[in-house]
């Protein structure tokens, strides 16, 4: 691709930046309040907390306007008992939020941590262990302070804050920002590493033009940090995009990104560079989806399944995907073609939706067997099929369909008649689900 002329994009990007950059007063207010939180934790802490660190985008001036999230990590010595780490982390978190008359609750990752609201500020107070780069983690969040330290050092000679904001807003517009298992997109940390690698938003979009699935990225800083040669043999990953974590070379930062979302990023990056527009940054995915859905629809079916209590999205979405793919395999085996499928969960219900190209089939189907010269294959075929005949060069037979209407197949699913064929995950069971015809629930 020819070299970009930044002047072709500068007006659009500046307009977007006016919308998404926090004001100086907003930044100052956030810093003052964060310092108060950290100071208070130090005051009330009578426990072996080695360090109290603010991490995340607000700590690195990489947040969007009106993002008032404050992430505080409490680092404990590696010898600290897990139960004690959990107990002390929860107590400190609750105590400091209560001191500021806030509202607190417990969230769950590998171990529980405290989240809360104090006015317009959202807080996460998370205990972790003090580890070094490439040291084996003890808990899943132990790398986060190291990520923060690496990025702050990298930004000392690189002012990339606005480029990071542009990338985040661009990905939000495309509906692919977020590394949760529901979104399967780009995490904030991944965004920062990509901007650091290519030294700018437009440079990144230009580089993306040559990407294909399985593309691999190693930051220049990694070679310097670990004194590695350029031909170093890194661990191989089988993911859509591979971005090596500077603080743990055995980890792929882009592991959560699925193939479709990577390809959306590649495609719409090309579209933006060819025909730049602010539209890409503002609900572009939703507008595009709404336009596509104005067409005449196929045959729509949704299964409504009761969602178990206290099962988080990072558990429920992979299980919905698993059961839906198992059902997809079954409907294909019975010759029903679908145009699309989606899943979505609200607080009470899991929705599995399909749009079928055809919902009713003839009573009979043609079963094509082996070529007539395949002696053993033909013998097996005629043993299991009556009324066989030759069509072109294959022995064939007509079979009566078990399901000629897709609705009947789904009724057997919810009545439990196909439970030996479909793979049931633990928390999403289609038995006794409600079938809604003519309805397709979009993921929100």
Curated annotation (Swiss-Prot):
Homodimer. Keywords: ATP-binding, Magnesium, Metal-binding, Nucleotide-binding, Nucleotidyltransferase, RNA repair, RNA-binding, Transferase, tRNA processing. GO terms for biological process: RNA repair; tRNA 3'-terminal CCA addition. It catalyses: a tRNA precursor + 2 CTP + ATP = a tRNA with a 3' CCA end + 3 diphosphate; a tRNA with a 3' CCA end + 2 CTP + ATP = a tRNA with a 3' CCACCA end + 3 diphosphate. This is CCA-adding enzyme. The keyword Membrane does not apply. A single active site specifically recognizes both ATP and CTP and is responsible for their addition. The gene is cca. It comes from Methanococcus maripaludis (strain DSM 14266 / JCM 13030 / NBRC 101832 / S2 / LL). It comes from the Archaea. CTP binds at residues 57, 60, 147, 168, 177. Transmembrane segments: none annotated. Its cofactor is Mg(2+). Mg(2+) binds at residues 69, 71, 124. Catalyzes the addition and repair of the essential 3'-terminal CCA sequence in tRNAs without using a nucleic acid template. Adds these three nucleotides in the order of C, C, and A to the tRNA nucleotide-73, using CTP and ATP as substrates and producing inorganic pyrophosphate. tRNA 3'-terminal CCA addition is required both for tRNA processing and repair. Also involved in tRNA surveillance by mediating tandem CCA addition to generate a CCACCA at the 3' terminus of unstable tRNAs. While stable tRNAs receive only 3'-terminal CCA, unstable tRNAs are marked with CCACCA and rapidly degraded. Belongs to the tRNA nucleotidyltransferase/poly(A) polymerase family. Archaeal CCA-adding enzyme subfamily. ATP binds at residues 57, 60, 147, 168, 177. SUPFAM superfamilies: Nucleotidyltransferase, PAP/Archaeal CCA-adding enzyme, C-terminal domain, PAP/OAS1 substrate-binding domain. InterPro entries: CAA_C, CCA-adding_arc, CCA_tRNA_nucleotrans_2, NT_2-5OAS_ClassI-CCAase, NT_sf, NuclTrfase_I-like_C, Polymerase_NTP_transf_dom, tRNA_NucTransf2. Its EC number is 2.7.7.72. It is an enzyme of class 2 (transferase). GO terms for molecular function: ATP binding; CCA tRNA nucleotidyltransferase activity; magnesium ion binding; tRNA binding. Gene3D superfamilies: Beta Polymerase, domain 2, CCA tRNA nucleotidyltransferase, domain 2, Poly(A) polymerase predicted RNA binding domain.
């Amino acid at each position: 691709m020819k070299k970009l002329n930044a002047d072709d994009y500068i007006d659009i990007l500046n307009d977007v930046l006016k919308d998404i950059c926090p004001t100086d007063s907003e930044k100052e207010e956030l810093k003052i309040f964060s310092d108060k939180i950290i100071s208070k934790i130090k005051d009330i802490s009578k426990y072996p907390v080695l360090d109290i660190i603010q991490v995340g985008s607000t700590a690195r001036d990489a947040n969007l306007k009106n993002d008032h999230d404050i992430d505080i990590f409490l680092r404990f010595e590696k010898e600290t008992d897990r139960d004690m780490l959990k107990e002390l982390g929860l107590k400190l978190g609750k105590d400091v939020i209560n001191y500021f008359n806030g509202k607190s609750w417990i969230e769950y990752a590998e171990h529980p941590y405290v989240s809360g609201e104090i006015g317009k500020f959202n807080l996460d107070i998370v205990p972790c262990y003090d580890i070094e780069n490439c040291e084996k983690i003890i808990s899943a969040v132990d790398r986060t302070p190291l990520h923060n330290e690496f990025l702050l050092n990298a930004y000392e000679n690189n002012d990339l804050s606005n480029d990071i904001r542009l990338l985040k807003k661009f990905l939000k517009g495309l509906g692919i920002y977020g590394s949760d298992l529901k979104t399967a997109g780009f995490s904030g940390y991944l965004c920062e590493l990509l901007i650091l690698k290519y030294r700018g938003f437009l440079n990144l979009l230009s580089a993306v033009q040559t990407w294909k699935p399985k593309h691999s990225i190693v930051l220049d800083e990694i070679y310097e940090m670990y004194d590695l040669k350029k031909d170093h043999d890194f661990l191989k990953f089988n993911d859509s995009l591979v971005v090596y974590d500077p603080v743990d070379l055995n980890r792929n930062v882009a592991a959560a990104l699925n193939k479709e979302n990577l390809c959306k990023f590649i495609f719409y990056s090309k579209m933006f560079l060819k025909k730049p527009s602010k539209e890409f940054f503002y609900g572009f995915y939703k507008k595009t989806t709404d336009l596509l859905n104005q067409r005449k629809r196929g045959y729509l079916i949704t299964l409504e399944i009761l969602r178990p209590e206290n099962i988080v999205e990072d558990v429920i979405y992979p299980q919905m995907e698993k059961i839906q793919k198992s059902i997809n395999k079954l409907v294909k085996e019975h010759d029903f073609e679908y145009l699309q499928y989606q899943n979505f969960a609200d607080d009470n219900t899991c929705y599995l939706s399909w749009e079928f190209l055809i919902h009713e089939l003839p009573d009979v189907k043609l079963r094509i067997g082996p070529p007539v010269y395949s002696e053993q294959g033909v013998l097996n075929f005629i043993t299991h099929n009556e009324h066989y005949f030759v069509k072109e060069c294959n022995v064939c037979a007509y079979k009566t369909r078990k399901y000629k209407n897709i609705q009947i197949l789904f009724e057997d699913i919810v009545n439990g008649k196909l439970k030996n064929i479909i793979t049931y995950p633990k928390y999403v069971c289609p038995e006794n689900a409600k079938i809604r015809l003519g309805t397709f629930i979009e993921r929100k």
